[in-house]
Regions:
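Short alpha-helical segment that forms part of, or immediately flanks, the ligand-binding pocket
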Residues: 274, 293, 297-301, 315-316
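Short hydrophobic beta-strand element within catalytic cores of glycosyltransferases
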Residues: 305-308
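A conserved mid-protein helix/loop that constitutes part of the nucleotide-sugar donor-binding site
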Residues: 205, 209-228, 244-250, 332
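Conserved acidic donor-binding segment of nucleotide-sugar-dependent glycosyltransferases
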Residues: 320, 324-331, 340-345
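A short, well-ordered alpha-helix in the C-terminal region of glycosyltransferases
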Residues: 258-261, 340, 347-361, 373
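Short alpha-helical donor nucleotide-sugar binding micro-motif in glycosyltransferases
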Residues: 96, 267-268, 275-280, 371
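Nucleotide-activated donor-binding/catalytic signature segment of Leloir-type glycosyltransferases, i.e.
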Residues: 250-268
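Aromatic "clamp/platform" in nucleotide-sugar-dependent glycosyltransferases that forms part
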Residues: 288
Length: 392
């Protein structure tokens, strides 16, 4: 069975393999287990892949239908123009006509086009909305349009969203995502079990941020909180990731004399990210808007104490004593939460242990099983598994 996919994640063909952003590829490898072929509508980039990219597990079963080239990578891409719409229409139509089913990954401009066009050609539809389903202040109109289309009767397939929200149509399905396989989950479980109950009682708290350095991620708020805590509380911060705000963040670190506390590591391979989870005590992600909060669920699996925004699905993830939430733009509230964690290592050791136990459900293998069940139910098909007599 052949699956069409519409995604904003750019792709590169390098050394005989298709490459893309690692978290996206790890999830799509799960879809590859369910379908014989993938026909992917995506931007086609040039040159060697960045360090944070990986190849698909099996590039021989992938066809990429590009709709634009050389427009930047990932979230750094330039916005689509009206002149690109014909190319988008052509690429989506070509993929929809050759596929047996279609998966739209929203939000994104290509997802908007696909959500309008693909139902004309396909009966087997499934969408993923990776943003904040209930909306966020200041979000683009195109994001609101995609949400409205996917909620409507025009979209005749399931839509997976993060969180269980009231008053939703029956085809809106609360779901999850993961990039940790069973082996990595076991590694996380071992790291959580090996943590010292006394934690950071005799040293500085080790704080971690993992993600893109963009304005919406509010890393500047984290740095401002550290500056407010000086000199009474010293917290070490490792920042893993890159983005347009890095230069401004580095200037702030220098101006506030935080150089001994804050380290920038840029983009690193995912296995190195796991090492940071093992070494840290706590993680903060106080974005202005967040879909799933991937870094939070990964850090929870490793037993870290997590601080997230009080928006979207994050309060559910960190509820029942599994973490703390603060307003996304409130450095004083974040500083207070960090002060509480730094001063109560034994109490918050238990917070991390509760988080680790709860998050073990979110593995890549668990994601595959959940997708099989979802598609089997909504498409009224036998369980999808192309490696056992192939999906028909």
């Amino acid at each position: 069975m052949k699956l069409g996919v519409a995604t904003i994640c750019p792709h590169i063909f390098h050394e005989g393999q298709w490459w893309s952003y690692e978290p996206y590829v790890l999830e799509m490898n799960v879809w590859q287990e369910l379908f014989e072929e993938l026909v992917i509508v995506a931007p086609h980039d040039q040159g060697p892949p960045p360090e944070s990219w990986v190849p698909y597990r099996d590039s021989s079963s992938i066809t990429v239908v590009p709709f634009r080239r050389d427009r930047g990578r990932g979230l750094l891409q330039e916005p689509a123009s009206f002149g690109e719409i014909p190319r988008m229409l052509y690429a989506v139509t070509k993929a929809a006509l050759t596929a047996d089913a279609f998966h739209v990954r929203a939000p994104g401009n290509i997802a908007l086009v696909a959500s309008l066009l693909v139902p004309l050609f396909q009966k087997r539809l499934v969408a993923k909305f990776a943003g904040q389903w209930i909306g966020a202040p200041g979000e683009a109109r195109t994001v609101r349009w995609q949400r409205a289309i996917l909620k409507s009767r025009w979209w005749r397939g399931p839509v997976t969203v993060y969180g269980d929200w009231p008053n939703q149509p029956p085809h809106i399905v609360p779901f999850f995502t993961s990039v940790l396989d069973n082996h990595q989950m076991a590694r996380a479980q071992a790291a959580a079990a090996n943590r010292n109950a006394a934690g950071w009682a005799d040293r500085n708290l080790r704080l971690l941020y993992v993600g893109r350095l963009s304005a919406s991620k509010n890393v500047a708020v984290v740095l401002e909180a550290l500056a407010q805590l000086k000199p009474a509380v010293t917290i070490e911060l490792d920042i893993v990731g890159d983005g347009p705000e890095r230069a401004a963040l580095e200037r702030f670190v220098n101006e506030q004399d935080l150089r001994r506390q804050v380290r920038f590591h840029g983009n690193v391979a995912f296995d190195r990210v796991l090492e940071f989870y093992e070494q840290a005590d706590a993680l903060t992600l106080v974005s202005a808007s967040e879909g799933w909060g991937k870094a939070i669920t990964e850090a929870m699996a490793f037993g870290l104490v997590c601080i997230g925004s009080n928006l979207g699905v994050i309060p559910w993830l960190l509820g029942e004593g599994r973490g703390l939430v603060v307003p996304p733009n409130d450095a004083t509230a974040l500083a207070s939460a960090l002060r509480e964690i730094a001063g109560s290592p034994i109490e918050h050791f238990q917070t991390g242990q509760r988080a680790a136990a709860w998050s073990q459900r979110f593995s890549l293998e668990g994601l595959g099983n959940a997708l099989r069940e979802l598609l089997g139910k909504h498409w009224r098909m036998p369980e999808l598994n192309p490696h056992s007599d192939k999906a028909k």
